[in-house]
């Protein structure tokens, strides 16, 4: 329900007449309190934006509130109170205050606690109580020009009150002021009950809304301050409304009068005190008045009925007293000002319970003060604070009124001065102890700040020492003595002690070398460099890591030394890692080639001895085949071995890698003593003619040397698997070189010399033709063998397994075919040139995919070389027919096998591509 009171004429049906505001039978008068309520309180409430529901009486008919006047027996509104004040309806101010309380109580009784109208009433009531607290302490009648005439008997009862000047306002602060009362004021005893009744009424109003959420008058009896309006403003108001001329009160009634004589002798405030004065002005501003008003004035314990206040609080303090001391230049340091402010808050916390409203207000105000005071500028070094002894003397020389205001329990001037001296000495001692504590805290913080970087530097130096020593021991085992001396110099420079790092500056050459070394670092190491610089340089801690610029001239020597130690360690690790990898690669390659060599020895053991194999195997390789085999190995090892050679600087490793690029790379470790240089093609031919007994063994050796130097690891595994076949044609398959079946497709020219070898009648041509074959292949199609090495390294194990299964299937088929073919083949000496010409004529017309398999079929057709020359002789016609039949059969077989091989390779290539995409 709302309590809205729109403007209305009091002639409506259903609404009772408004309360009376003029009663001739009831005597009334005009007092200073009533005048203050009319001119200050009513105006303030009327201007408030929440006052519109309370300006007129409640229109129950319009608002559809039929039970309003049944519940509310005594309605009241601001218009009625205003008219009563204008017509001198009230005899004293307490009657008007009761009307205000009735208006607010009616709102609380009729409406629910959470309604908007209730919250508006609470805000207005708080404003009303603040204004009433600023009202003068004693009430007396004044002559009003607007009134028709004084009421009978009023002059007799207010003769003494008329001559009385306005007394100081009732103030709720920490410090009680002793006011000098003139002799004629002793007859004004009836004014004291009025103050007591006003206080009691305020307390009653507080109890009524103690459960509300907004601050109320409950804070007044135990609060630490009261008003925002200063005393000169009220005096000016009284002089303006009383008579036509201002009233000058006696100087003895104004406690501010003694310090006024010192205005001409004021000294200039320091920067810190100016900042404190600004803080004080801000706390007096309207911005903080909602929770700072209880601390504006000293606590009036007698008026508020706080009889035990001065028994608990021995040193009261308030913001007005602090302001007076600031204006009187009694503060020589900002710490004294802060001590008084904190004393004021501590008194509030000490006297009031923790859950009291004024305690929460004090906490809010103290938070504001501490936040502002923490930003106070630093004190200059040449500023010397005044000694506490001189400060105590200055405090003693103050006016009697200010000394009396600091001691509320004194009954005589002597006791007051003694207590004040003790308080000042205690305060000076407390300030000295606070200064010592602050200095001690600052000292501890400085020690922590200085010790933390040192501990971090020591940890980094110890870690760099250990890592540097490990790197040094590893490098000593690899480098030459001359290089070791350079390493020792760098290591001694990197492992210097912390004292040397801090004191030893870095020369220009060292800075230039450090800059070059930092540029050599990889990208992942540069982040650590930035972290080292930020940890040691306070000015660079807030910079962006992506846009940081390093100037070595501005960095500290310790930072440069730490960077040097870190960079040297990183570069050493970078140099040590590549040789290890190259060694491992070389060992793996040696083992692989040695295994392939042993397998080749086992396969060819039937034809020749092991010793002859070891001595003739490398010598039968031509210079062209060595260049073809080196093309694959050099392409795969150039990226790693070249970089390692340039970094390590070891001549032994360079020579080893150069030798590894030759044709005997597979068995260079075992046979380096006997064959340091690869023989020329002519020497290979001589050794072949001298040691090999027949052409079949020579061709078998050549076919075997080819896969050992050109085919990858897959070919060696297939060779090893093929030697276990228990078939009579085992020697033939080993000699003809089955592993080339897994080699990539080659050009048609690769098979032409091999086919021609069948029709040769001399063994010399048979021995020399394979050499020419390999020479032509190397010179014309070296790129195909390079792609073979790349393909072998890229294919996964799944492709190898599929090749192995296909190889086994092919081997069985080939063995079966060769067994049937060997029965009807004739010797090589009786072959004519006609089949050779026919073969050469039909080969260029075949497609490229079909001709790519000619080397494989050539190896199959070389099988007649395996049987002994003393085979069964047949007629020439039968031989020609058999050869023609064989050609046609092989052609058809080639066509079928070429399609199968293409499909398999295509499938394997697609599978590899999909895996790489994943």
UniProtKB/Swiss-Prot annotation:
Belongs to the BET family. Residues 605-617, 877-896 have a biased composition (Basic and acidic residues). Residues 399-416, 622-648, 739-764 have a biased composition (Low complexity). PROSITE patterns: BROMODOMAIN_1, BROMODOMAIN_2, NET. Residues 29-135, 267-376 form the Bromo domain. Residues 426-452, 815-902 form a coiled coil. A motif (Nuclear localization signal) lies at residues 204-215. The gene is brdt. Pfam families: BET (PF17035), BRD4_CDT (PF17105), Bromodomain (PF00439). Testis-specific chromatin protein that specifically binds histone H4 acetylated at 'Lys-5' and 'Lys-8' (H4K5ac and H4K8ac, respectively) and plays a key role in spermatogenesis. Required in late pachytene spermatocytes: plays a role in meiotic and post-meiotic cells by binding to acetylated histones at the promoter of specific meiotic and post-meiotic genes, facilitating their activation at the appropriate time. In the post-meiotic phase of spermatogenesis, binds to hyperacetylated histones and participates in their general removal from DNA. Bromo domains mediate interaction with histones that have acetylated lysine residues at specific positions. Bromo domain 1 mediates binding with histone H4 acetylated at 'Lys-5' and 'Lys-8' (H4K5ac and H4K8ac, respectively). The bromo domains also recognize and bind a subset of butyrylated histones: able to bind histone H4 butyrylated at 'Lys-8' (H4K8ac), while it is not able to bind H4 butyrylated at 'Lys-5' (H4K5ac). Residues 575-584 have a biased composition (Basic residues). It comes from the Eukaryota. InterPro entries: BRD4_CDT, Bromo_Brdt_I, Bromo_Brdt_II, Bromo_chromatin_reader, Bromodomain, Bromodomain-like_sf, Bromodomain_CS, NET_dom. The record marks 111, 116 as: Histone H4K5ac binding. The lineage of its organism: Eukaryota, Metazoa, Chordata, Craniata, Vertebrata. This is Bromodomain testis-specific protein. It is found in: Nucleus. Residues 496-578 form the NET domain. Keywords: Activator, Bromodomain, Chromatin regulator, Coiled coil, Differentiation, Meiosis, Nucleus, Repeat, Spermatogenesis, Transcription, Transcription regulation. GO terms for biological process: male meiosis I; male meiotic nuclear division; positive regulation of gene expression; regulation of RNA splicing; sperm DNA condensation. Residues 1-26, 241-267, 379-430, 575-712, 738-764, 862-899 are annotated as: Disordered. CDD domains: Bromo_Brdt_I_like, Bromo_Brdt_II_like. GO terms for cellular component: nucleus.
């Amino acid at each position: 329900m709302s309590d809205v009171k729109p403007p209305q004429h009091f002639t409506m049906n259903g609404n009772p007449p408004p309360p009376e505001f003029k009663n001739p039978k009831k005597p009334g008068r005009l007092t200073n309190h009533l005048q203050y309520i009319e001119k200050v309180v009513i105006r303030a409430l009327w201007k408030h934006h929440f006052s519109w529901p309370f300006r007129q009486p409640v229109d129950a008919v319009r608002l559809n509130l039929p039970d309003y006047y049944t519940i509310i027996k005594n309605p009241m509104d601001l218009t009625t109170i205003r008219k009563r004040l204008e017509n001198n309806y009230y005899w004293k101010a307490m009657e008007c205050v009761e009307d205000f309380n009735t208006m607010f109580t009616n709102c609380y009784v009729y409406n629910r606690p959470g309604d908007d109208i209730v919250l508006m009433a609470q805000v207005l009531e708080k404003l009303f109580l603040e204004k009433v607290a600023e009202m003068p302490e004693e009430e007396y009648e004044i002559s009003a020009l607007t009134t028709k005439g004084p009421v009978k008997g009023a002059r007799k009862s207010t003769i003494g009150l008329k001559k009385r000047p306005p007394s100081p306002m009732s103030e709720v602060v920490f410090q009680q002021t002793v006011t000098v009362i003139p002799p004629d004021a002793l007859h004004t005893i009836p004014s004291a009950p009025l103050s007591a009744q006003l206080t009691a009424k305020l307390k009653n109003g507080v109890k009524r809304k103690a459960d509300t959420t907004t601050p109320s008058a409950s804070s007044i009896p135990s609060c630490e301050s009261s008003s925002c309006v200063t005393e000169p403003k009220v005096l000016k108001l009284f002089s303006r409304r009383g008579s036509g001329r201002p009233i000058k009160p006696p100087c003895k009634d104004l406690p501010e009068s003694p310090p006024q004589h010192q205005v001409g002798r004021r000294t200039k405030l320091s920067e810190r005190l100016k900042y404190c004065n600004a803080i004080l002005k801000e706390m007096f501003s309207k911005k903080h008045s909602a929770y700072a008003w209880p601390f504006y004035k000293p606590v009036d314990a007698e008026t508020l009925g706080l009889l035990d206040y001065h028994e608990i609080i021995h040193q009261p303090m308030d913001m007005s007293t602090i302001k007076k001391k600031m204006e009187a230049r009694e503060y020589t340091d900002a710490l004294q000002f802060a001590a008084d402010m904190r004393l004021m808050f501590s008194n509030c916390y000490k006297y009031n319970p923790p859950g009291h409203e004024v305690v929460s207000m004090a906490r809010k105000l103290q938070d504001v003060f501490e936040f502002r005071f923490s930003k106070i500028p630093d004190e200059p070094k040449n500023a010397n604070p005044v000694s506490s002894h001189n400060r105590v003397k200055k405090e003693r020389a103050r006016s009697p009124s200010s000394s009396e205001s600091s001691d509320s329990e004194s009954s005589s001037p002597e006791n007051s001065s003694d207590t004040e001296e003790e308080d000042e000495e205690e305060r000076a001692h407390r300030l000295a102890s606070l200064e010592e504590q602050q200095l001690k805290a600052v000292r501890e913080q400085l020690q922590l700040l200085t010790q933390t970087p040192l501990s971090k530097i020591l940890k980094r130096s110890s870690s760099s020492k250990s890592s540097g020593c490990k790197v040094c021991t590893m490098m000593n085992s690899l480098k030459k003595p001359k290089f070791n001396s350079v390493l020792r110099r760098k290591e001694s420079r990197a492992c210097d002690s912390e004292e040397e790092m801090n004191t030893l500056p870095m020369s220009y050459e060292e800075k230039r070398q450090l800059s070059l070394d930092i540029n050599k670092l990889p990208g992942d190491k540069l982040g650590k460099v930035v972290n080292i610089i930020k940890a040691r340089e306070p000015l660079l801690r807030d910079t962006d890591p992506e846009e940081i610029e390093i100037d070595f001239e501005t960095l500290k020597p310790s930072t440069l030394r730490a960077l040097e130690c870190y960079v040297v360690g990183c570069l050493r690790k970078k140099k040590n890692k590549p040789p290890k990898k190259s060694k491992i690669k070389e060992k793996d390659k040696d083992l692989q080639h040695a295994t392939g060599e042993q397998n080749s020895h086992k396969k060819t053991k039937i034809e020749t001895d092991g010793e002859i194999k070891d001595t003739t195997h490398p010598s039968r390789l031509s210079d062209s085949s060595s260049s073809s085999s080196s093309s694959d190995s050099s392409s795969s090892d150039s990226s790693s071995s070249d970089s390692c050679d340039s970094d390590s600087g070891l001549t032994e490793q360079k020579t080893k890698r150069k030798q590894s690029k030759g044709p005997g790379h597979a068995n260079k470790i075992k046979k380096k003593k006997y064959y340091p240089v690869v023989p020329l093609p002519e020497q290979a031919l001589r050794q072949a003619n001298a040691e090999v007994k027949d052409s079949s063994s020579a061709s078998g050796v050549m076919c075997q040397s080819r896969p050992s130097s050109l085919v990858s690891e897959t070919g060696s595994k297939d060779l090893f698997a093929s030697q276990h076949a228990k078939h009579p044609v085992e020697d033939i398959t080993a000699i003809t070189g089955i592993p080339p079946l897994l080699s990539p497709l080659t050009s048609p020219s690769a098979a032409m010399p091999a086919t021609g070898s069948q029709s040769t009648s001399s063994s010399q041509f048979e021995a020399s033709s394979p050499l020419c074959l390999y020479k032509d292949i190397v010179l014309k199609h070296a790129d195909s063998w390079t792609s073979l090495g790349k393909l072998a390294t890229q294919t996964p194990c799944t492709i190898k397994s599929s090749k192995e299964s296909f190889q086994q299937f092919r081997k069985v088929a080939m063995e079966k075919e060769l067994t049937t073919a060997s029965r009807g083949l004739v010797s090589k000496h009786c072959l004519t040139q006609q089949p050779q010409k026919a073969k050469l004529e039909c080969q260029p017309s075949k497609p490229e995919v079909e001709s790519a398999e000619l080397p494989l079929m050539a190896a199959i057709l070389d099988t007649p070389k395996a049987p002994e020359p003393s085979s069964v002789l047949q007629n020439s016609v039968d031989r020609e027919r058999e050869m023609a039949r064989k050609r046609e059969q092989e052609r058809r077989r080639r066509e079928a096998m070429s399609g199968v091989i293409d499909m398999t390779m295509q499938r394997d290539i697609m599978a590899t591509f999909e895996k790489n995409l994943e």
